[in-house]
Amino acid sequence: MRRADGQPVTVLVVDDEPVLAEMVSMALRYEGWNITTAGDGSSAIAAARRQRPDVVVLDVMLPDMSGLDVLHKLRSENPGLPVLLLTAKDAVEDRIAGLTAGGDDYVTKPFSIEEVVLRLRALLRRTGVTTVDSGAQLVVGDLVLDEDSHEVMRAGEPVSLTSTEFELLRFMMHNSKRVLSKAQILDRVWSYDFGGRSNIVELYISYLRKKIDNGREPMIHTLRGAGYVLKPAR
């Protein structure tokens, strides 16, 4: 899903829980969107002025000010800015307060990442920010992945991948130069927590290396104790 002008959607994620903010950000990057994060209200307002996001994911409970105060400020400067509110509060009056303050939609913690993505997609369509879903070519160095045709090329040569290998590579390319832990890969590619007992990630990383690197300068690297990273060959 892209903006009406063909550019990637820019999302501002505002949450004072770093792990949660990173989890949401990673899922949205997987959608091909550009992500900016802020951990408090003041930073959020500054980031919105600097980045001009297309949509905001805003936690109601922030350390320096209420998320609703942030919402009022954002709306005073950009009345049409779509905002999805996140909160641990589940009382009806809290939901009403958030929507009355100008929030376009509301998700209560704990939530599924899939729900956040779907609500953002619907919100972007409803507010006219985006038009139609559009696949994209992901490019990292001489590695190219086409999300529409599922074709993969390395140095101009086709690479044949299984569906799971393709999803793993796509996830790594959306997060190129970022270290991805085994748990993050399991959650995104397999949507299942094996409790650290499975070697399925190691197995599929090995499969990808044989097909992607295959005698060339390596792009897939292991950081012992941390995870895996895909980056352009030197």
Swiss-Prot record:
<dbReference type="GO" id="GO:0000156">
    <property type="term" value="F:phosphorelay response regulator activity"/>
</dbReference>
<keyword id="KW-0804">Transcription</keyword>
<feature type="DNA-binding region" description="OmpR/PhoB-type">
    <location>
        <begin position="135"/>
        <end position="232"/>
    </location>
</feature>
<feature type="domain" description="Response regulatory">
    <location>
        <begin position="10"/>
        <end position="124"/>
    </location>
</feature>
<protein>
    <recommendedName>
        <fullName>Probable transcriptional regulatory protein TcrX</fullName>
    </recommendedName>
</protein>
<dbReference type="GO" id="GO:0000976">
    <property type="term" value="F:transcription cis-regulatory region binding"/>
</dbReference>
<comment type="function">
    <text>Member of the two-component regulatory system TcrY/TcrX.</text>
</comment>
<keyword id="KW-0597">Phosphoprotein</keyword>
<dbReference type="InterPro" id="IPR001867">
    <property type="entry name" value="OmpR/PhoB-type_DNA-bd"/>
</dbReference>
<keyword id="KW-0238">DNA-binding</keyword>
<feature type="modified residue" description="4-aspartylphosphate">
    <location>
        <position position="59"/>
    </location>
</feature>
<dbReference type="InterPro" id="IPR011006">
    <property type="entry name" value="CheY-like_superfamily"/>
</dbReference>
<keyword id="KW-0902">Two-component regulatory system</keyword>
<dbReference type="GO" id="GO:0010106">
    <property type="term" value="P:cellular response to iron ion starvation"/>
</dbReference>
<dbReference type="GO" id="GO:0032993">
    <property type="term" value="C:protein-DNA complex"/>
</dbReference>
<dbReference type="Pfam" id="PF00486">
    <property type="entry name" value="Trans_reg_C"/>
</dbReference>
<dbReference type="GO" id="GO:0006355">
    <property type="term" value="P:regulation of DNA-templated transcription"/>
</dbReference>
<keyword id="KW-0805">Transcription regulation</keyword>
<dbReference type="InterPro" id="IPR036388">
    <property type="entry name" value="WH-like_DNA-bd_sf"/>
</dbReference>
<dbReference type="GO" id="GO:0000160">
    <property type="term" value="P:phosphorelay signal transduction system"/>
</dbReference>
<keyword id="KW-0963">Cytoplasm</keyword>
<dbReference type="GO" id="GO:0005829">
    <property type="term" value="C:cytosol"/>
</dbReference>
<dbReference type="Pfam" id="PF00072">
    <property type="entry name" value="Response_reg"/>
</dbReference>
<dbReference type="InterPro" id="IPR039420">
    <property type="entry name" value="WalR-like"/>
</dbReference>
<dbReference type="InterPro" id="IPR001789">
    <property type="entry name" value="Sig_transdc_resp-reg_receiver"/>
</dbReference>
